[in-house]
Amino acid sequence: MDFTVIRSKRKSLSIEIKKGEVLVRAPKRTKDKEIEKFLLLKKDWIEKHLEIYKERNKNLIPFTDDEIKEFTRKAKEIIPERVNFYAEKIGVIYNRITIRHQKTRWGSCSSAGNLNFNCLLVLFPLEVIDSVIVHELCHRKQMNHSKNFYDEIEKIFPEYKKYHKYLSDNGGQYLRRLP
């Protein structure tokens, strides 16, 4: 079995399946023999999850460059307008908005107030887009994921949990289609 070992300042071994590859995360001084023993112990889990990955991705057709450009164009039309609406409602300011095709995130907010959004959001209902926008704008008040942060979101967007779950349940199939 092929695998990649990533050594770092950590205390325990872990295995991750990422894009069909086996990644072993290990403390810096872990001996190769110990890693091999760990892999043998986790062999069934690894095989099961590699199979799940293959099954999930076998019929996925990657988005073309033209499709991504079109998603980006639409996102640049829709998202800034929604951000302005909710920023005023929440009472926050932001620096700039960037639309990207990120493979792992739907949105982010930097401490400088820069907002980033995934162009693939345009493939979802407007309420899903709004839930991501409100989440990122609420970071302008609290740069964390505390209970207070989520209470702030709920004040502005009471159905946040419903649409966040929708994106969690359905978003991966689109992210996996990015080249």
Regions found by a protein language model. Name each.
Residues 1-131, 140-179:
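Active-site-proximal or metal-binding-adjacent scaffold patches in catalytic folds
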